[in-house]
């Protein structure tokens, strides 16, 4: 965004280095807890069955809201392969849980509440 273009010299170089480094971070995180296997992704897991390290469309992981729209229109289908799936990206008034899917973005970036979930 504009914030990066407005940085100068060493600050911009450092920001660019951190951005490049962030490209090596995982797109999907799996955590085994007492409550089972928890999968965390930004917006969606683009499959009806989770498999660790399964190749998936990264753009869908980051941006896709189709599953949430389907859930909210009454098509309640969870994802097989793990006990819980945690998503953000789409600000909602309150946390939304359906089947084994949990949407916890409550718009903190826009002045809404910050929702946290303790997995263990």
Language-model segments: residues:
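Acidic, His/Gly-enriched loop-helix segments that form or flank divalent-metal centers
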Residues: 1-103, 107-113, 119-120
């Amino acid at each position: 965004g504009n914030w990066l273009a407005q940085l100068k010299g060493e600050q911009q170089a450092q920001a660019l280095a951190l951005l490049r480094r962030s490209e090596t971070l995982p797109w999907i995180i799996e955590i085994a807890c007492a409550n089972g296997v928890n999968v965390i992704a930004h917006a969606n897991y683009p499959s009806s069955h989770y498999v660790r390290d399964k190749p998936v469309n990264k753009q869908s992981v980051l941006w896709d809201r189709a599953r949430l729209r389907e859930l909210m229109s009454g098509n309640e289908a969870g994802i097989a392969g793990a006990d819980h799936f945690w998503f953000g990206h789409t600000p909602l008034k309150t946390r939304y849980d359906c089947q084994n899917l949990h949407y916890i973005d409550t718009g903190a970036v826009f002045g809404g509440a910050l929702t946290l979930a303790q997995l263990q």
